[in-house]
């Protein structure tokens, strides 16, 4: 029996969506998928409904490499409300404690310094991490607290922007798995007044340029202009996409002659000139350096296929 035909276009690449406030990451993912009429789509790390900013959305074959963006560094701009702590550590939650603001500028700098570098962070109960098969926020909504292991995070840069009254603004460049809400909650406790997030914007993921972000409104306008005709859609929308290999562009490249690449596509490990001694590599084919997927250097120094792109007829 033949496989059922997938609905939608074979469109491949990464869209840098400027996520609006007040909607979930999955909601905007589905909207982008419909606008592009794409057969496959996936985002690369959810943003809270309150948050805005860069949400890379992988389409088609690019979804195979979304994990590499989940593992990448992020940069955020955050504004905290001082003097109030909420159950979710952001403005979407309920205020559970109010305290006076009584710290000095010196106290603030000392507190900020303690978050720079590599530290251990206990995730919020209001997160999508799982405990015994259920997401933490499902327990939290039932008023339950379950054990969470501290996880290692790295804050590469924590820049003070401003402190005015009960508002504190920071810019944070951090490693994967860092919860900005938790940093703000922990900072509020160190300062003795409590704090929660009232504004959060993701400025950057990996090395993707901020100026390449597009809004849902811009996408919808282009799609309407194209009158949903497939050829017009590709001309109007596909030019907005980053290449499908962009999530793995920082990995070492191994370029294979077409004949050798053919064996790799059949699942065989192959010898390659100038390959690194170990680790994951980005594999390209021929003089055009066409991206064909990711491989790993095996114990014999050969390139073994790990995640390859399916080739579609043009």
Curated annotation (Swiss-Prot):
Top-level EC class: isomerase
Q: Which residues form the active site?
A: 48
Residues annotated to bind substrate = 43, 76, 179, 200
**CDD domains named among the record's database cross-references:** PseudoU_synth_EcTruB, PUA_TruB_bacterial
Q: Which reaction does it catalyse?
A: uridine(55) in tRNA = pseudouridine(55) in tRNA
Record organism: Pectobacterium atrosepticum (strain SCRI 1043 / ATCC BAA-672) (Erwinia carotovora subsp. atroseptica)
Q: List, alphabetically, the Gene3D superfamilies matched.
A: Pseudouridine synthase, PUA domain
Q: What is this protein called?
A: tRNA pseudouridine synthase B
Which EC number applies? 5.4.99.25
GO MF annotations in UniProt: RNA binding; tRNA pseudouridine(55) synthase activity
NCBIfam families recorded: TruB
BP-aspect Gene Ontology terms: mRNA pseudouridine synthesis; tRNA pseudouridine synthesis
Q: Which family does it belong to?
A: Belongs to the pseudouridine synthase TruB family. Type 1 subfamily.
| Name of a matching Pfam family | TruB_N
The record's keywords, sorted A to Z, are: Isomerase, tRNA processing
């Amino acid at each position: 029996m033949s496989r059922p035909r997938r609905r939608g276009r074979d469109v491949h690449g990464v869209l840098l969506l400027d996520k609006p406030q007040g909607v979930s990451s999955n909601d905007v993912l589905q909207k982008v998928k419909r606008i592009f009429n794409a057969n496959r789509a996936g985002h690369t790390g959810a943003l809270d409904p309150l948050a805005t900013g860069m949400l890379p959305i992988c389409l088609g074959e690019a979804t195979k490499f979304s994990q590499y963006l989940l593992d990448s560094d992020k940069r955020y701009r955050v504004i905290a409300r001082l003097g109030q702590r909420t159950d979710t550590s952001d403005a979407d939650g309920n205020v559970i404690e109010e305290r006076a603001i009584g710290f000095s500028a010196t106290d603030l700098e000392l507190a900020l310094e303690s978050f720079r570098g590599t530290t251990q962070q206990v995730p919020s109960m209001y997160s999508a991490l799982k405990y015994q098969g259920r997401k933490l926020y499902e327990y939290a909504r039932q008023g339950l607290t379950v054990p969470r292991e501290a996880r290692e995070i790295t804050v590469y840069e924590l820049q003070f922007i401003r402190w005015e009254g009960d508002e504190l603004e920071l810019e944070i460049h951090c490693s994967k798995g860092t919860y900005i809400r938790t940093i703000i909650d922990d900072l509020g406790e160190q300062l003795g007044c409590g704090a929660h997030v009232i504004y959060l914007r993701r400025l950057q993921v990996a090395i993707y340029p901020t100026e390449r972000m597009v809004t849902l409104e811009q996408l919808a306008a282009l799609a309407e202009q194209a009158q949903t005709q497939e050829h017009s859609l590709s001309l109007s929308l596909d030019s907005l996409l980053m290449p499908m290999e962009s999530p793995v562009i920082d990995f070492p490249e191994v370029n294979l002659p077409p004949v050798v690449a053919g064996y790799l596509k059949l699942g065989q490990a192959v010898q390659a000139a100038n390959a690194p001694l170990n680790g994951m590599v980005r594999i390209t084919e021929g003089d055009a350096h066409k991206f064909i997927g990711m491989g790993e250097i095996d114990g014999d120094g050969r390139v073994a296929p790990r995640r390859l792109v399916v080739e579609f007829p043009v």
